[in-house]
Amino acid sequence: MRQRRISGSNLMMVLCVVAMCRAVPINDLIYRASQQSDKLHALSSMLTQELGSEAFPIDRVLACHTSSLQTPTDKEQALQVSESDLLSLARSLLQAWSDPLEVLSSSTNVLPYSAQSTLSKTIQKMQEHSKDLKDGLDILSSKMGPAAQTITSLPFIETNEIGQDKITKLLSCFRRDSHKIDSFLKVLRCRAANMQPQVC
């Protein structure tokens, strides 16, 4: 009975948080999402720099499991894409990294001992930020219509063995995609604030 009360209390807390978020204006939701994505990209950049994977060969980055998704390649192209489509792209990329981040989290033992602790803690933070950002974008998409709610499936094929080279590749791919997500949300933030395109 006590466990049931606790579960009921947790459910009520979640519902209250969702209700409050749904009452928040779209501009504020976009601003919060942009801040969250900025933190996520900063973490991924820091980790790739620490592990020396920043200069990963571009031809191998093109082999990322998300490469099939057609996305704007620069700010000028992103400015031509609708708000709903930008949000859909950001959500698709974010969803595509749910499983790979789990794989990275469970594979830190293959790295040199000195790097294991740093990688483990940072990936845990990236998972937390990803989940928070996903929850925020889900609420935001519900306010922006069907197009924003569309998610393109980008399957991740997990291999039985994962070594340092595979970890390096995944981290480089995640840094690339987290930069895209951050860029798309910054464009949305600019539009929500009615800023001129040239200053976005």
UniProtKB/Swiss-Prot annotation:
Entry GO CC: extracellular space
A biological-process GO annotation: positive regulation of receptor signaling pathway via JAK-STAT
InterPro entries the UniProt entry points to: 4_helix_cytokine-like_core (IPR009079), Somatotropin/Prolactin (IPR001400), Somatotropin_CS (IPR018116)
Record carries keyword Acetylation: no
Range of residues in the leader sequence: 1-23
Location (main, coarse): secreted
Keywords: Disulfide bond, Hormone, Secreted, Signal
Family: Belongs to the somatotropin/prolactin family.
UniProt name for this protein: Prolactin-2
Gene: prl2
